[in-house]
Amino acid sequence: MAPTPNRTPIVAVVGATASGKTGLSLDLAERLRGEIVNTDAMQVYRGMDIGTAKLPVAERRGIPHHLLDTLTVRDPATVAEFQSWARAEIAEIRGRGRTPVLVGGSALYTRAILDRFEFPGTDEAVRRRLEAELDALGPAALHERLRAVDPEAATRILVENGRRIVRALEVVEITGRPFTASLPTMEYADPRTVQVGVDIDRPTLDARIVARVDAMFAAGFVEEVERLLAEGLAEGRTAGRAIGYREVASYLTGELSLAEARERTVSATRRFSRRQDSWFRKDPRVTWIRYDDPGLVDRAVSVVAATLDG
C-alpha cells in the first residue's frame, strides 16, 4: 500500500554514486528532524560494508537509519519486497512526526518506493529456468535476448545486471508485454514528496570513484569479500552480483589479478554511475543542486519547504 498522505514530507536525495548524497542526507535529517531510509539495494546486507560505502555507525551523527544490515548475503531481495519494507518504514517515521529522508544509489528502488508502481506477478518455474540459463550462458547472452523482445528495457539494464535481466525476461514471458510497461509511472504515491539531486560534473565524479575504489581496497575490501564468500555470497541471488564483490571474488579464485579486479571495479562503477545519472535526469521532478554550492543544504531545505507550501 502507498504511504498515507499527511503533512510530513517524504524527502529523497538522489544522484550518482560518490556524488555526495550521504552527506546531504545527514544534513537534511538534522535540519528536518529526520530519519534516514536506505534505498541502496546492497546496503541491506549484513557484512557488505566496505564495498557498498555503508556509513559506519560512528559517522551517522546519532540519526536513526533504517533498512541497513537486515539480510544475510544468501537472502534474495526483490524490488517489490524493498518497496514494501521502505513504505512501512516511511509510514512509521511519519507517524512519529519525523521526516523520512531516503538516500541510496538504486534508481529503480527509489522510483518504486516514491511512485505509483504495482508489480506484475512472478512465476517461479519461469524464474528458475531463466536463472539456470543465466548461470549457463552468462548475462550477455540473456541481455541480447532481452534486446530482441524489449529493446527499451535492454537500454535501461546493464549487461552485467543478470538479476534484472532475468526479471525483465520473466515479466515479458508471463505478461506478454514489455518489461518497461510495468515500470513506475511518474506520479508520486504521496503528493508531499520531494526529490533533491546532487549535481556533479563527470570528471570530478570519475576522480571520486577512483579514490573511493582505492580506499575500499586499502580498507580491507578483499578480506571482506573473502569472509562473505565463506558465508554464502556466491550463492546469493542478489548480493552475489554486487559491483566490486564479483570482481574481487574472481581475484580470489585466480581468474583476475588484484590490479585487474581493481580496474574492473572502477570501470563497472563508472558505468553504473552513468546509468544512475541517466535514470534520475529523466525525472523532471528532481531539483538539482551543485555538489559544491556553498548553500547546498539551505537550498535543499528551501526545496522541501516549497513542497510543504504547495
Curated annotation (Swiss-Prot):
Query: Subunit comment for this entry?
Result: Monomer.
Give the top-rank taxon of the lineage listed in the UniProt record for this protein: Bacteria
Q: Which PANTHER family match?
A: TRNA DIMETHYLALLYLTRANSFERASE
Catalytic reaction equation(s): adenosine(37) in tRNA + dimethylallyl diphosphate = N(6)-dimethylallyladenosine(37) in tRNA + diphosphate
* The keyword Amino-acid biosynthesis is annotated on this UniProt entry: no
Task: List the EC numbers from the record.
Answer: 2.5.1.75
Q: What class of enzyme is it?
A: transferase
| Organism from which the protein derives | Nocardioides sp. (strain ATCC BAA-499 / JS614)
Q: Which HAMAP family match?
A: IPP_trans
Gene Ontology biological-process annotations: tRNA modification
Record: residues binding ATP: G15, A16, T17, A18, S19, G20, K21, T22
Q: Which family does it belong to?
A: Belongs to the IPP transferase family.
Gene name of the encoded protein: miaA
Q: Which residues bind substrate?
A: T17, A18, S19, G20, K21, T22
Q: Which NCBIfam families match?
A: miaA (TIGR00174)
Nucleus among keywords: no
Q: What is this protein called?
A: tRNA dimethylallyltransferase
Give an example GO molecular function.
tRNA dimethylallyltransferase activity
Cited Pfam families: IPPT (PF01715)
Return the InterPro entries for the record: Dimethylallyltransferase, IPT, P-loop_NTPase
Main function: Catalyzes the transfer of a dimethylallyl group onto the adenine at position 37 in tRNAs that read codons beginning with uridine, leading to the formation of N6-(dimethylallyl)adenosine (i(6)A).
Keywords, alphabetical: ATP-binding, Magnesium, Nucleotide-binding, Transferase, tRNA processing
